[in-house]
Amino acid sequence: MDEVRQFLPPFIADEAVFDGWTPTARDAAAAAQGVEAGLATPAFDKGPMDMIDAWIGHIDAQMIEAFPPERIAAMKIRERIRALVAFRFEAVAHQREALRRATAIMALPANLARTARISWRTADLMWRLAGDTATDYNHYTKRMILSGVYGSTLMAFLDDESPDFADTHAFLERRIDNVMQF
């Protein structure tokens, strides 16, 4: 079951472009990848948020793999955060419509608590990869601020039609500049 939850999400995202985050998308992805429906259905039995959460978890895993300590060690903290946030957008650039549909589902009132947990998990992971070891109030404020930066930049990314997402990168840079003014 865990293997299916780790393997299938990017393929569900590919199908979500056409079918939304639905059982139809899940089943089409499973069929295309040779995964039995009897395994795919219970792996995502709590509906769209299960599929979306697993997809975001997959992106988290890609980010961990892409940023080993030796790659990130030479960067300044600001550069680390910028690179980590930018990576997440690059990882889903070909699935922006799936991301757009996912954000709509995540914004539903019934999903806000889980969305907040997912956002926190992602911000925490980025800070940990960046080398943050804070355990005092800074631990919490850094993650809350990064969640806001990431979320607002995500909205800019969804509407960005500039070459190589230059507008998104510029937006991210401005948000980081805003945070540095605190």
What are these regions (language model features)?
Residues 110-132, 141-147, 151:
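Amphipathic alpha-helical packing segments from all-alpha helical-bundle domains
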